[in-house]
Amino acid sequence: MKTESEVGHHMASSTLNVDAFRDYLETQLKRLPPLPDVEQISPRVIRVLGQNPGEFTLQGTNTYIVGTGRSRLIIDTGQGSPQWIENVVFLLESMGIILSHVLLTHWHGDHTGGVADLIKSYPHLTTAIYKNSPARDQNNIIDGQSFSVEGATVRALHTPGHAHDHMCFVLVEENAMFTGDNILGHGTTAVEELGPIMSSWRRMLTENCERGYPGHGQLIHNLNHKITEQLASKVRRENLVLDALRCIRGQQGPQMAGRRMSINPKQLVILVHGKGINENVSTLVLEPFLIETLRKLAADGIVGFEICNGEKRWFPVQTV
């Protein structure tokens, strides 16, 4: 997968359109390395693929069975694929494993969709489902909470941004981290709120974990490097937006004295990416990226917005 900055450069081509972007995603999916349905990827971790491959789930959701003894825990449950629960049941029965805890990284359906099938197959798990901001009949996970089974202890980190309830889990014995959807094995993740996820990435860095077990994609061997890359990409985009806003302020002539110059996201796309962008690509792809950045900068007090004729327009504050 290309980096976010490379994708942004690719999307700036005047020949790009929505179909081409979809084709790009499909091509990138085909280039992903295949992952086995079930694989022992460390002495303490077995990965079971969720059987839900797609443009945004990559090879499928990774679910992890953690521990070395008879009693183990599972992190995430896939999307509810019948093949996933069949693979999980076969694995547990063949290895004599009993699940003690079901830990969910966040609420999205491709991570929680298999909960009902797990409970149907193993009714004792009805009271063993754990998630931050839990649904009814689930148990809460709080920041710093630990879960232990034979051979493994995982410690929860509240890391919002991809989702408000997102949790990562540090596997203490391996100095590794289950990163959920905050960091993927390929490419970059979708963001609910940019400011919180950047703070979460910085917090994840302080754990100094060597290995990452992501919610989607292959094993991450240098986790801090991957996190640092993601942070740098977002900071670069912030700088592009700020440079563009400085540009419009610099163009303010004497006739605009005392009046504020502001622009809408569509105009900002042109300033950042140039003219000739397909309108659908601008609306569906580029504008949401820039709005995400603008909201973060507004929360930081660096930019502001005003409503003009029902339209939100953005401007730099004087400290920019």
From Swiss-Prot:
Pathway(s) where this gene product acts: Secondary metabolite biosynthesis
Which InterPro entries does the UniProt record give? Answer: LACTB2-like_MBL-fold, Metallo-B-lactamas, RibonucZ/Hydroxyglut_hydro, Sec-metab_biosynth-thioest
What this protein needs as a cofactor is:
Zn(2+)
Details of cofactor binding:
Binds 2 Zn(2+) ions per subunit.
SUPFAM superfamilies from the xrefs? Answer: Metallo-hydrolase/oxidoreductase (SSF56281)
Q: Which PANTHER family match?
A: ATROCHRYSONE CARBOXYL ACP THIOESTERASE, ENDORIBONUCLEASE LACTB2
Q: What does this protein do?
A: Lactamase-like protein; part of the gene cluster that mediates the biosynthesis of dibenzodioxocinones such as pestalotiollide B, a novel class of inhibitors against cholesterol ester transfer protein (CEPT). The biosynthesis initiates from condensation of acetate and malonate units catalyzed by the non-reducing PKS pks8/GME11356. Pks8/GME11356 lacks a thioesterase (TE) domain, which is important to the cyclizing of the third ring of atrochrysone carboxylic acid, and the esterase GME11355 might play the role of TE and catalyzes the cyclization reaction of the C ring.
What is the recorded name of this protein? Lactamase-like protein GME11357
Starting at the broadest rank, the lineage of the source organism is:
Eukaryota, Fungi, Dikarya, Ascomycota, Pezizomycotina
